[in-house]
From Swiss-Prot:
Listed NCBIfam families: PRK04204.1-2, PRK04204.1-3, RNA_3prim_cycl
Protein's name according to its UniProt entry: RNA 3'-terminal phosphate cyclase
Gene3D superfamilies: RNA 3'-terminal phosphate cyclase domain (3.65.10.20), RNA 3'-terminal phosphate cyclase, insert domain (3.30.360.20)
Keyword Nucleotide-binding among record annotations: yes
Family according to the record: Belongs to the RNA 3'-terminal cyclase family. Type 1 subfamily.
Gene that specifies this protein: rtcA
UniProt KW Nucleotide-binding keyword: yes
Organism: Salmonella heidelberg (strain SL476)
Length: 353
């Protein structure tokens, strides 16, 4: 029997990413694991509905034996079986993130015995998770360059706290994975500001987009790209239908020569449209102020596929606790090593086998 890998869920940032990465890697490598202190660093530790759905989705896809799969559990033992392609459907039962559930199981399905389709119901635009737009516009184009055939479709928007959204991904087995090198993002080609509204007054989106646009003509003069590109940003205000609200999301997509990045914030009761726009502007400005190719959140999403490819590198302005914790977990399962080298403008992250 394979050696059981013992993991401490309280290590590093102590969040759900430790569990999600462990589930993905356990399915792929066939190595069982047991974890204690699940989400110990969060206000509500243990398995929430989103995490429990990820565990049960992984269990179904590989026929795993599992202990501790219940709400609030802070301990889990997971013994995987063979990965099986096919049609899968999972419901979170809350506004928990569909995207995080998908990101848990999709890497395993890159190594399945056939094509797969996975549909998840829950939240699609969540504050503490990649949005469906991020997955479709940012992450999947990079995966395609690595040799991964995966396409996610947003079926219905779902916002916190109601949820009610859905997304589905069709994925094909990968014959081989190629490394990816993202050292420079190149010139900015196009920027698009988009406000999504569901059962929220239209003027909220108009104010968000106007505030976002107004930020950049007065931006610091040493950030060359800002004045050159943001006044020309495309501006869209989209009113959604179909009872998927209330909810509001504002995003700024920055398409560069080497990759696309997307920065988003979400409207909540008691927060003005201008404050939402200021949050997006702050994140986008911080990204453009650095020559690093990859934003902080995308860096987290690249660790697992690069590790599976066994090679690759990227630059990022900040090595977050989330990033470093994910690296530690990956290195427990795979015979790869990451280096995170400080540079004048941030960090150079490399992986090799």
């Amino acid at each position: 029997m394979a050696r059981i890998i013992a993991l401490d869920g309280a290590q590093g940032e102590g969040g759900g990413q430790i569990l999600r990465s462990a589930l993905s890697l356990s399915m792929i490598t066939g190595q069982p694991f047991e974890m204690s202190g699940i989400r110990a660093g969060r206000a509500k530790p243990g398995l929430l509905r989103q995490h429990l759905t990820a565990v049960r989705a992984a269990t179904e896809i590989c026929g795993a034996q599992v202990n501790g799969d219940e709400l609030g559990s802070q301990q889990l033992r997971f013994t995987p079986g063979p990965i099986r392609g096919g049609e899968y459907r999972f419901a979170i039962g809350s506004a928990g993130s569909c995207m995080l559930v998908l990101q848990t199981v999709l890497p395993a399905l890159w190594f399945a015995d056939g094509s797969s389709r996975v549909e998840v119901h829950g939240g699609t635009h969540n504050q503490a998770a990649p949005s469906a737009d991020f997955i479709c516009r940012v992450w999947e184009p990079l995966l395609a360059r690595m040799g991964i055939s995966q396409r996610t479709t947003l079926i219905k928007h779902g916002f916190y706290p109601a949820g009610g959204g859905a997304a589905a991904t069709v994925v094909e087995p990968a014959t081989s994975l190629r490394g990816l090198t993202l050292i420079s993002r190149g010139e900015t080609l196009r920027t698009t500001a988009e406000a999504l509204l569901a059962a929220v007054p239209y003027h909220v989106g108009e104010r968000e987009v106007a505030t976002l646009e107004a930020h950049f003509p007065q931006a610091e003069k040493n950030v060359v790209a800002l004045e050159a590109h943001f006044p020309q940003a495309e501006k869209n205000v989209v009113a959604l239908e179909g009872g998927c609200g209330p909810g509001n999301a504002l995003s700024l997509m920055i398409q560069s020569e080497q990759l696309t990045e997307l920065f988003a914030a979400f409207g909540v009761k008691g927060t003005s449209a201008e404050a939402v726009a200021n949050q997006v502007a702050h994140e986008a400005r911080r990204y453009l102020a650095s020559p690093a190719a990859v934003g902080e959140h995308l860096a987290d999403q690249l660790i697992l596929p690069l590790a599976l490819a066994g090679e690759g590198a990227f630059t990022v302005a900040r090595a977050s606790a989330h990033l470093l914790t994910n690296i530690v977990v990956v290195e427990r399962f795979l015979p790869v090593r990451f280096s995170c080298e400080a540079t004048e403008s941030g960090y150079l992250v490399r992986v090799s086998d």
